[in-house]
Amino acid sequence: MIPVKVENNTSLDQVQDALNCVGYAVVEDVLDEASLAATRDRMYRVQERILTEIGKERLARAGELGVLRLMMKYDPHFFTFLEIPEVLSIVDRVLSETAILHLQNGFILPSFPPFSTPDVFQNAFHQDFPRVLSGYIASVNIMFAIDPFTRDTGATLVVPGSHQRIEKPDHTYLARNAVPVQCAAGSLFVFDSTLWHAAGRNTSGKDRLAINHQFTRSFFKQQIDYVRALGDAVVLEQPARTQQLLGWYSRVVTNLDEYYQPPDKRLYRKGQG
């Protein structure tokens, strides 16, 4: 099965239709080569900083393959992904203008010889948002292919039409009907967060890089409290829309002084539903 692709600058109706029908879509030519090259370099630098701060042993115990969390803390380059017009248009259309970033994770997926990739959560079939709410879309993922997604590089496997299902499909069905989302570097891969998917297995002989974003309605807790993790000063340096996505307008008060504030100073602003 060929991945569902729509051309950049096309009507959002096509993206919405693909999400409704099969649960995912690919938008090509979003990032140019200069941006890709800069992002690759910066991801490796962030990986080194995380390794230094957390330590190889603790990272190994987590049972992850090349996951980079909280990249914005280590390099402001990664804030710019929250300003990309295609990202904002999809988030606004599928969720809401008040949606927030649940996570931004980089992936430097290492290569292994065939049949020797460790079994971890990433390459088991799963949903990023395991809650089906009677057709109510509460979460959407937007992943950037920083390197080409192919069978050999470990393109993400998706099971078309498996989204918005209350019961988990049989594992045999998932394995037999999964298709790799193959796309060029610079493409954007968007999917309903209830879609069953798994990381592919990279046997290409080199790393494969990607960045995944998950956006939710503002009343769902983030994987990381980005406002606290980054600090008020850093968040306030960002554009207003980025502040919104980071959760600046949906913070939880901690005392009565914070609670009894005028509308323009409240931590949890009106209309964040």
Swiss-Prot record:
Q: Which InterPro entries match?
A: Phytyl_CoA_dOase-like
Q: What is this protein called?
A: Uncharacterized protein Mb1539
The organism's taxonomic lineage, starting at the top? Bacteria, Bacillati, Actinomycetota, Actinomycetes, Mycobacteriales
Q: Per its UniProt record, what Gene3D superfamilies does this chain match?
A: q2cbj1_9rhob like domain
Among the Pfam families in the record, one is: PhyH
Superkingdom of the source? Bacteria
State the family named in the UniProt similarity comment for this chain: Belongs to the PhyH family.
Q: Which GO molecular function annotation, any one, does this entry have?
A: iron ion binding
